[in-house]
Amino acid sequence: MVSVRGWLQCDDGQLAQIKEIVEADDPEHTYSGGWAFPARQYNNVRWAFYGGDIRAVSLDWFEERLRQIAQIPASYQDDKYDERPRGLFLVSHDVDGMSEWRVHNGGLVIGLPDGDYHYLDA
């Protein structure tokens, strides 16, 4: 099993696209039910959260969804900031241990965690 937990931050238009990507999956045959979208969001940033224990064979599915989400373009062009969706996910595999998945700059970067998050695996 693999424990996946994390979040994305975005704007209104991007959140609508994230929901479209998530809702395209059948929750009876995927782990798309792990996504949560707060009913009331505050200020300018919108949030999407994911939490769930999934089978290791489904990790490719989750990775593909994050890659799709990462490629959602900025709603408004800004030369100073990259306004595409960004976020952080901690992925704990029973065998391979923990990895950190960073969504930013239009892509997904998977690596070792920068912090000591192993207490989450207790």
Predicted regions and their residues:
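Short, extreme N-terminal segment that most often corresponds to the first beta-strand
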Residues: 1-23
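Charged interaction segments
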Residues: 21-122
